[in-house]
């Protein structure tokens, strides 16, 4: 099975080459970039991957790359690499969600451990993304009327109350409610509520 995709962004070709050899030997798919802008143009918005990002580069700092990733909706976990221990930069990077901040020279075990943590995070993110996409696809099956009924069921209204709210008979509400449960592939109101809670969870 593919171990995961690691993107490496560093303006030093010798550093890139050394990291690429190490990572390929460990079974990872590797893409290297000396230009942050080239990485940002190529970075995927989905899939399981992480990025090793040099802190200090001439065209754009690693922190600026991280900010741009957030703005562009690139949720890939970031591991920062720095030639020196910059405490303020490390603190900012971690606040913005970096997995780790490593100071060169970096030991192989330390780096591979950070990459495993980053790819575990990426795998969890991808599972949530796929799950959310599946829920959104099911929701698209509902008619506007069924969606109205669904929203009121989630709010805890009884069939009679829903009928009064929407101007329909209780029997018609039951029909719509049954269609909602079938199309959303749930078998209880509790499961329906959980489905929407998962959809609204931004994590």
At which residue positions do the language-model features occur?
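Basic, Lys/Arg-enriched C-terminal extension of HTH/homeodomain DNA-binding domains
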Residues: 181-203
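Acidic catalytic/metal-coordinating carboxylates
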Residues: 34-35, 61-64
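Receiver (REC) domain active-site loop signature in two-component systems and cognate sites
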Residues: 57
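C-terminal output helix
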Residues: 86-88, 102, 106-115
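Conserved acidic segment of CheY-like receiver
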Residues: 2-15, 19-23, 36, 51, ...
């Amino acid at each position: 099975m593919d171990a995961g995709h690691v993107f490496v962004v560093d303006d030093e070709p010798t550093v890139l080459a050394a990291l690429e050899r190490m990572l390929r030997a460990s079974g990872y798919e590797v893409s290297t970039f000396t230009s942050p802008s080239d990485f940002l143009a190529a970075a995927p918005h989905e899939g399981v991957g992480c990025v090793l990002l040099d802190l200090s580069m001439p065209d754009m700092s690693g922190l600026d790359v991280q900010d741009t990733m957030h703005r562009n909706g690139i949720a890939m976990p970031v591991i920062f690499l720095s030639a020196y221990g910059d405490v303020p930069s490390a603190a900012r990077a971690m606040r913005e969600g970096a997995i780790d901040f490593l100071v060169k020279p970096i030991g192989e075990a330390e780096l591979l451990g950070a990459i495993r943590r980053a790819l575990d995070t990426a795998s969890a993110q991808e599972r949530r993304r796929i799950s959310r996409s599946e829920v959104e696809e099911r929701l698209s099956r509902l008619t506007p009327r069924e969606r109205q009924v669904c929203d009121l069921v989630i709010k805890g209204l009884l069939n009679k109350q829903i009928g009064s709210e929407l101007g329909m008979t209780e029997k018609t509400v039951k029909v719509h409610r049954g269609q909602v449960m079938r199309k959303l592939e749930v078998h209880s109101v509790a499961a329906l509520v959980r489905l929407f809670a998962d959809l609204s969870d931004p994590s």
